[in-house]
Amino acid sequence: MLEKNPVISVKNLNKEIGNHRILNDISFSVCSGEILGIIGHSGSGKSTLLRCLDFLISPTSGSISIAGFHNSSAKEKISRSDFAKRVAYISQNGGLFLAKTVFENIAYPLKIRYPEMTKSLIEEKVNEALHFLNLYERKHAYPSRLSGGQKQKAAIAIAIVSDPQVLLCDEITSALDPRSTEDITDKLLQLNEERGITQVFVSHEIEVIKKLCTHTLVMHQGNIEELGPADKLFLNPYSSITEELFHMNSIAKGIYDHNENEEILRLGFPKGLAVQGMISQLIQGGQISINILSGDINLFRKIPLGFLIIVLSGEKKLRDRAKDILIGKGVIVQKFQKSR
């Protein structure tokens, strides 16, 4: 996420409300075409950070640069209309006008931001967005007649009709059923891959983060706990908070009483290794045994990544040899400490 001129740059950002610090010395950057997922427990500061990026609230200190706009500029010099042409914010509730049809809702920002735009061009752009989101047949419907997924698609159409550089998405799939969530994330991924739209996505749904994000920022109590490529954080997390959020150690911790000739390992299989069988190679000869506690193959932006939690049994030198073989093949090997 290092680039001389990133689309988003945040440096030493702090936000305090009264005596309570919501954000503490936050620094990161997002390059063109990346999707950054922000995850963390409730109250960790995720949505506050996103609202700071959209200039909806002002930080106590620190700097934000996004799509050429800077929070250090005088507020009166930043036109909200100009800002919204480049940066679109999508909330959980969608923010549709109840008295306007889907078509009218999508056309409204174009009329406000581009008063010189012809009626025919507005209609062309709105219809293009409607077709992209598979909403054309609902263009004359009012929000009260839409499903939750359709409302959120309409909100995305409103966001993209002005061709923004950046999309800021705040828990936009949290109230949707699995099918609607899949439809929405497919469209967001398509926007990224085909149009190169940079995105920041706040979510507590880890499967959504896996599917969409190139990078993940883990927050805890207003601090950045961990930051890096999404697949690397999944396979080799540094922080226990990241482990917990990715649900990787719930089975192993505290449920297996192992002895001195056993150890619990987490094996991470990067792309290209997730579908290769290696375990059978290790147990040939019968000198060690492997008990699989859990495992899964996950798709990160369509790339398969796998992990296993195993109990490796045998003499220490044989276990060490087995681990060396795995590491030599590119497997990430981590040892669980026995729970107390």
UniProtKB/Swiss-Prot annotation:
Transmembrane segments: none annotated. SUPFAM superfamilies: ACT-like, P-loop containing nucleoside triphosphate hydrolases. Residues 8-246 form the ABC transporter domain. It is an enzyme of class 7 (translocase). InterPro entries: AAA+_ATPase, ABC_transporter-like_ATP-bd, ABC_transporter-like_CS, ACT-like_dom_sf, MetN_ABC_transporter-like, NIL_domain, P-loop_NTPase. The keyword Membrane applies. It catalyses: L-methionine(out) + ATP + H2O = L-methionine(in) + ADP + phosphate + H(+); D-methionine(out) + ATP + H2O = D-methionine(in) + ADP + phosphate + H(+). SMART domains: AAA, NIL. Keywords: Amino-acid transport, ATP-binding, Cell inner membrane, Cell membrane, Membrane, Nucleotide-binding, Translocase, Transport. It holds the Pfam family ABC_tran. Its main location: membrane. It is found in: Cell inner membrane. One of its GO terms (molecular function) is ATP binding. It is a peripheral membrane protein. One of its GO terms (cellular component) is plasma membrane. ATP binds at G40, H41, S42, G43, S44, G45, K46, S47. Its EC number is 7.4.2.11. The keyword Cell inner membrane applies. The complex is composed of two ATP-binding proteins (MetN), two transmembrane proteins (MetI) and a solute-binding protein (MetQ). Part of the ABC transporter complex MetNIQ involved in methionine import. Responsible for energy coupling to the transport system. Belongs to the ABC transporter superfamily. Methionine importer (TC 3.A.1.24) family. This is Methionine import ATP-binding protein MetN. It comes from Chlamydia felis (strain Fe/C-56) (Chlamydophila felis).
